[in-house]
Amino acid sequence: MPLPCDTILQAALIVTQDDARTVIEDGAIAIHEGRIAAVGQRDAIVGNWHGATVIDMGASLIMPGLVNAHTHASMTLLRGLADDLPLMDWLTGHIFPVEKGLTGELVELGALLGCAEMLRTGTTAFSDMYLIEDATLRAVDRAGLRCLAGEAIFAFPSPAYADPETAFDLVRAQHDRWKHHARAALAVAPHAVYTSTPAILARCRDLAEELGLPIHLHLAETATETAQCIEQHGARPVPYCDGLGLLTPRTTLAHCVDLTEGEIDLLAERGVTVAHCPESNMKLASGIAPATAMLGRGMTLGLGTDGAASNNSLNMFTEMTSCALLHKVHHMDPTCAPASAVLDMATRGGAHALHMQGIGRIEAGCPADIIALDLRAPNMQPIFNPASHLVYAATGHETRLAMVGGEVLYLDGCYTRFDMDDLLKEVRKARTWAMEQVRAAR
């Protein structure tokens, strides 16, 4: 007699991203109470399981939802606000002045727009660092994605706190509010070495230890940052942070562009995870992170889009393409960054960066965070190697379905938890606000 389950999901092809990287033709997944109960051939699953709901995606490819290892979701509201500038000019001359006027309502609106973009292009979980993160998590709660959120901690006031001394109490309060949420988690997120002091970074380390939270930090993004760190602290960013005890297996570092070979060895020894953001690094001309060297040392890398103000997209499929192509031409070696390794970064590596066990793969016992791509799209045929298609051919807009915890959040152009037309009306109003902030800052 078939076992009961909530949902049976069927499709022409399943890319599991399990340890064996199994690919199943004419497959199905049994889902019960938000988790994958079984995955296998369609006939076997249908014969052994009875689903209260059956979703037949037909000529689609099912795979784990992508994981964005580093972004600032609310910065969708600043997309295209300032382009073609070096990082520090972009930040201090354009982004920081506008962000001074942010409110919780605006952060929530921008985060919801970011969630919509991510679902539409196959991302079901993300690591966020921004301002007024309670508002980001309200958007996450509304949209249904998973999120590791970190309130950016600075050595100066932010829209979330007038006094940096109160930032730590704010993070504690956020942790208390969200620690039992099924899809949200908190990180301690000192923004960067150049926006912090040694005392603030040490307190971030202590707070993370106290609450059992991971650390999320921008580090070694540019050579300018390195020079400034040497001038102010007498050390390069990586050894400086190591001396403060910030580099642990619970730490994810965004960017890590300007590294020495010895620093790569140190990061590998400490078990740190790196969120590689190739498109943002290219657009800001920050440099090229030594991703292949880090992978060669056995490090875990996730893939991140960074914010839509510096990318200008939250599309993880295009990020995968850029990652693979960038490292091939940088090293003049077509074997660098193979499709399988880049796909791992966008799934399993991202899951590791978010410290969320089981996502980024499709196998029994894992959360049912799943997407389906339309194989009827001309660019998706013929299929010889699914990983190749996902990294080099897919655009993200083939996404037909996005599911988190067994719940359908997006299906064939429709969002199940919010109205996109209503959201866009509010976004257009926010554009007027952003333009006013720009004028006031000049």
UniProtKB/Swiss-Prot annotation:
Substrate binds at residues 99, 191, 221, 306. Binds 1 zinc ion per subunit. Zn(2+) binds at residues 70, 72, 218, 306. Coiled coil: none annotated. The keyword Zinc applies. GO terms for molecular function: 5'-methylthioadenosine deaminase activity; metal ion binding; S-adenosylhomocysteine deaminase activity. The keyword Phosphoprotein does not apply. Its EC number is 3.5.4.28, 3.5.4.31. Its cofactor is Zn(2+). Keywords: Hydrolase, Metal-binding, Zinc. It catalyses: S-adenosyl-L-homocysteine + H2O + H(+) = S-inosyl-L-homocysteine + NH4(+); S-methyl-5'-thioadenosine + H2O + H(+) = S-methyl-5'-thioinosine + NH4(+). Belongs to the metallo-dependent hydrolases superfamily. MTA/SAH deaminase family. PANTHER family: AMIDOHYDROLASE-RELATED DOMAIN-CONTAINING PROTEIN, AMINOHYDROLASE SSNA-RELATED. Catalyzes the deamination of 5-methylthioadenosine and S-adenosyl-L-homocysteine into 5-methylthioinosine and S-inosyl-L-homocysteine, respectively. Is also able to deaminate adenosine. This is 5-methylthioadenosine/S-adenosylhomocysteine deaminase. It comes from Nitratidesulfovibrio vulgaris (strain DP4).
